[in-house]
Amino acid sequence: MPQLNPNPWFFIMIISWLTYSMIIQPKILSFTSTNPPARKEPTTNTTTPWNWPWT
């Protein structure tokens, strides 16, 4: 079974992940968020019950 032979694909997978980890990921993480998260207090919704006319 050729899937079990790690020679052709294992090296490519390792090189791909190293490329992602060393080059692409720091560039992506250097961007600042345009909308930084802010701490907000949760609001409770005050709703009035609906009176159905047929009950």
Swiss-Prot record:
Region feature (Disordered): 34-55
Highest taxon of the lineage: Eukaryota
Transmembrane segments: 7-24
A biological-process GO annotation: proton motive force-driven ATP synthesis
Entry membrane topology: Single-pass membrane protein
GO cellular component: mitochondrial membrane; proton-transporting ATP synthase complex
GO molecular function: proton transmembrane transporter activity
Low complexity bias: start-end ranges: 43-55
Subcellular location: Mitochondrion membrane
Primary location group: mitochondrion
Family to which the UniProt record says this protein belongs: Belongs to the ATPase protein 8 family.
Function: Mitochondrial membrane ATP synthase (F(1)F(0) ATP synthase or Complex V) produces ATP from ADP in the presence of a proton gradient across the membrane which is generated by electron transport complexes of the respiratory chain. F-type ATPases consist of two structural domains, F(1) - containing the extramembraneous catalytic core and F(0) - containing the membrane proton channel, linked together by a central stalk and a peripheral stalk. During catalysis, ATP synthesis in the catalytic domain of F(1) is coupled via a rotary mechanism of the central stalk subunits to proton translocation.
Protein name: ATP synthase protein 8
Organism per entry: Vireo altiloquus (Black-whiskered vireo)
Gene that specifies this protein: MT-ATP8
